[in-house]
């Protein structure tokens, strides 16, 4: 049985994205820029480097208002050239 994300969430709700990308200075700015387009606000993402330092993990939490917002952000964050994965 497959459960859909919108069946598990009650909106509005805090929703955290973890974005993994190349360890470049512009990664955080690009992530925040995309998030600001769909969920304007003040964000202070946390950044953790990988063990070898080649990648960074950026965690950012938004106040999601509907499932379409969540899905759109997954897609647009994944479309950033230096991003490798969005969880």
Swiss-Prot record:
Gene3D superfamilies: 3.30.70.260
Top-level taxonomic group: Bacteria
InterPro entries, per database record: UPF0250_YbeD-like, YbeD-like_sf
One annotated Gene Ontology cellular component of this protein: cytosol
SUPFAM superfamilies: YbeD/HP0495-like
UniProt cross-references to NCBIfam families, sorted A to Z: PRK04998.1
Membership in a protein family: Belongs to the UPF0250 family.
HAMAP family according to UniProt: UPF0250
Annotated protein name in UniProt: UPF0250 protein CKO_02527
Organism: Citrobacter koseri (strain ATCC BAA-895 / CDC 4225-83 / SGSC4696)
């Amino acid at each position: 049985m497959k459960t859909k994300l919108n069946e598990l969430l009650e909106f509005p709700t805090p929703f955290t994205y973890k974005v993994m990308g190349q360890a470049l200075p512009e990664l955080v700015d690009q992530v925040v820029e995309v998030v600001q387009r769909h969920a304007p606000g003040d964000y202070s993402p946390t950044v953790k480097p990988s063990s070898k330092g080649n990648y960074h993990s950026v965690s950012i939490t938004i106040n999601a208002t509907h499932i379409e917002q969540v899905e759109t952000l997954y897609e647009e964050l994944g479309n950033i050239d230096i991003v490798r994965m969005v969880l």
